[in-house]
Amino acid sequence: MSSAVMPPRRRVSKLFGAICFYVLAFGVAGYAVFAYGVMPLGALVHPDMKLNFIAHQAGIYTHVFASLVALTLSPFQFSGRLRSKRPQLHRLMGRIYLGVGVVIGGLSGLYMAAFAFGGWVGQLGFACLALGWLFTGLRAFQAIRSGAVQAHRNGWSAMFR
């Protein structure tokens, strides 16, 4: 529905949702850069968790920074303006999002799930989240490759529900 025919209340609601999405995505990304890029590893977590982070530095850094790529690209990928005015850029960013953010972030998350703080419940939750991202990313990629644009959009938006 275009904004010209969209009821004013719906436009405000949609704008509010978009602003919240951008603020949260960039806020979490900024925190991740600070917590894992500026501060010493594990400085902001429980001491036992810090030991776990230090024991698995490569896994934690790979997961955090690959997932950071997905987090910072996601608001732009949901932009209808970008999709319509710069489709090649949308596709390039989508490939980076999928290849780095979802595949590398998901696989490193699956690896890190074995060492997640919080016992088997934390480990299972972390593993399910990683598998969910990998599965949803694969389905969305398959959808766009087969020309199913709406299924592709639904797949990507499912990652943020």
Language-model features: locations:
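Alpha-helical membrane insertion/targeting regions
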Residues: 2-161
